Amino acid sequence: MPAGLITALPNQLRAITMQLRLDTNGELSETSQQTVGVPFVENARMTCRKVDVHYGEKCAIKNISIDVGRNEVLAMIGPSGCGKSTFLRCLNRMNDSLASCRVSGDITLDGVNIYAPTVDVVPLRAQVGMVFQKPNPFPKSIFDNVSYGPRIHGLATGKADLSEIVESSLIKAGLWDEVKDRLHESGTSLSGGQQQRLCIARAIAVSPEVILMDEPCSALDPIATAKVEELIAELSTQYSIVIVTHAMQQASRVSQRTAYFHMGSLVEVGATEKIFTNPGHQLTEDYITGRFG
């Protein structure tokens, strides 16, 4: 057999196998929807069981079951449109604002079902904070950006207490030394990287248990990205962090576990080192090695 044909066969077989995994609607077949790896952890901060999300008649994510551990960084990776950001928004009910969105399944925070009718989404979103892809400071002073949450949630008993929360949050976000003499200036006057750390300080100020990050470094330069990644490592000693990222190198640097999503399904979850060096599913390997995605 010609050497070129021998070389080509593995790729041809992989392509055939990939096609067999897809049904006629271009979705994962039932046999490939079983998540590979270790999606569950002991004493989890958050648990998700059989979570489906529909936008009207369209199923965006299906049958997602995974835990978020205490004081861990969980990275979610996958091709654009695979459902990872949709799932992230389920964790603090950000999808509630979309009239066409329906979420089913169970998601708990410290054992409480966050979709129960008695749950108020305002305190929930304080407990499970969100940092978005594009920095979005309020058009207020740096001080007011950070103090806004503690004020409306009644976490400060007076001005001195509020000032202490602001300082502590900015210190945790690695921003205090850069802004301590300009707290009266607008948050929008900061650089992009500083604005993103300000948004992280704003989330920290209301004492969350979980911080969600949706591509937090995609709009930042490499230096600002490095600072945010260092900050994520520091914050993980106090909070659970779930980060969506397209940068696989970033996922490998900042997370303890990584989850791979594909076409609305959770394909594999496991220790980050294993996911990137010895994945258990062919779809994961193909994405990690750049064969598709």
From Swiss-Prot:
Its EC number is 7.3.2.1. One of its GO terms (molecular function) is ATPase-coupled phosphate ion transmembrane transporter activity. The keyword Nucleotide-binding applies. The keyword rRNA-binding does not apply. It catalyses: phosphate(out) + ATP + H2O = ADP + 2 phosphate(in) + H(+). CDD domains: ABC_PstB_phosphate_transporter (cd03260). It is a peripheral membrane protein. Pfam families: ABC_tran. PROSITE patterns: ABC_TRANSPORTER_1, ABC_TRANSPORTER_2, PSTB. Keywords: ATP-binding, Cell inner membrane, Cell membrane, Membrane, Nucleotide-binding, Phosphate transport, Translocase, Transport. GO terms for biological process: phosphate ion transmembrane transport. One of its GO terms (cellular component) is plasma membrane. ATP binds at residues 78-85. It is found in: Cell inner membrane. Residues 46-288 form the ABC transporter domain. The complex is composed of two ATP-binding proteins (PstB), two transmembrane proteins (PstC and PstA) and a solute-binding protein (PstS). Part of the ABC transporter complex PstSACB involved in phosphate import. Responsible for energy coupling to the transport system. Belongs to the ABC transporter superfamily. Phosphate importer (TC 3.A.1.7) family. This is Phosphate import ATP-binding protein PstB. The gene is pstB.
